[in-house]
From Swiss-Prot:
InterPro entries: FabA_FabZ (IPR013114), FabZ (IPR010084), HotDog_dom_sf (IPR029069)
Name used for this protein in its record: 3-hydroxyacyl-[acyl-carrier-protein] dehydratase FabZ
Protein family according to the UniProt entry: Belongs to the thioester dehydratase family. FabZ subfamily.
Highest taxon, organism lineage: Bacteria
Localisation per UniProt entry: Cytoplasm
Molecular functions per Gene Ontology: (3R)-hydroxyacyl-[acyl-carrier-protein] dehydratase activity
Length: 144
């Protein structure tokens, strides 16, 4: 299990754009599961939507991409590099995510070719699918 600080040791995201609170499982270069506890204090709820707070779908996808980043950037040869979101296919939103929900973020690598990987990504709340997509991730340059 990785806490927020350990996640930040792997991926370059920081507040307010770090959207993963914990990593529960990492299976080498194959799979990872993360958690995002969605609170009423999230800044995006101020405008999305007043009186009816719903987590923006693009941020759910970003949270999934960050879990993908933990898989790819956790590899020794990629330490210190940046991960780039390179594509999305078949994205579907099936459930609204609201304050008080806990997002379970699961990514499984389905194809790896050099610095580019594809993965099946699923975000769930209480076992219900909130979002699913196929993501493409690319390894970028080292950052300082």
């Amino acid at each position: 299990m990785l806490d927020a600080q350990q996640i930040q040791d792997i991926i370059p995201h920081r507040y307010p754009f770090l959207l993963v609170d914990r990593i529960l499982e990492v299976e080498g270069e194959k799979r990872a599961v993360g958690i995002k506890n969605v609170t009423v204090n999230e800044e995006f709820f101020n405008g999305h939507f007043p009186g009816y707070p719903v987590m923006p779908g693009v941020l759910i996808v970003e949270a999934l991409a960050q879990v993908f980043g933990v898989i790819m950037l956790g590899k020794e040869e990629n330490k210190g590099k940046i991960g780039l979101f390179a594509g999305i296919d078949g994205c579907r939103f099936k459930r609204q995510v609201k304050p008080g929900d806990q997002l379970r973020l699961e990514v499984e690598v389905t194809r790896l070719r050099g610095p580019v990987a594809k993965g099946k990504a699923v975000a769930t709340v209480d076992g219900e699918v909130a979002c699913e997509a196929e993501l493409t991730f690319s390894i970028g340059p080292k950052v300082s």
